[in-house]
């Protein structure tokens, strides 16, 4: 039983200031209204977590899918979507379960199962609906320079961690 939390490691990003600099004199800000894409500062802080030693970064707060990104050989799930909340917005209905395999060397494989919020219940997304959700995840991930292979026969998708041989 844990009784003293003072000695537990905390996320280094939560205990230090963070500043992003560019090589140009102009400041770059992302004021995009699109919630289906991670903001520049979100990506930067998640990259920082990987740079500081995280093997996997998983985000769940935006309640909508934001895609997957392979960064320095590690996976960032920018947002898995929604799982339980009863938000009544259609864009919060599709979601995913991220599965992984690991061995002593670390994570070796990531698979995606599509899910859907149907009348406030989380259910597996099968058939055409499942493939639409997986294709959406693949498209969002492609925008983050990450390839997600969709297996339409089994309603599953696989993150390709190493694309050097493609």
Where would I find each of the regions flagged by the language model?
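Active-site-proximal beta-strand elements of phosphoester/diester hydrolases
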Residues: 1, 77-80, 111
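Long, Pro/Ser/Thr-rich low-complexity/intrinsically disordered regulatory tracts in eukaryotic proteins
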Residues: 16-19
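Electropositive phosphate-/nucleotide-binding environments in soluble metabolic enzymes
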Residues: 22, 43, 90, 127, ...
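A short C-terminal boundary segment appended to hydrolase-like catalytic domains
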Residues: 97-166
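Conserved beta-sheet core of the metallophosphoesterase superfamily
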Residues: 37-97
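Solvent-exposed loop/turn segments at secondary-structure junctions
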Residues: 2-5, 29-32, 62-65, 82-85, ...
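Active-site-proximal segments of metal-dependent phosphoesterases and phosphodiesterases across multiple
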Residues: 1-12, 23-53
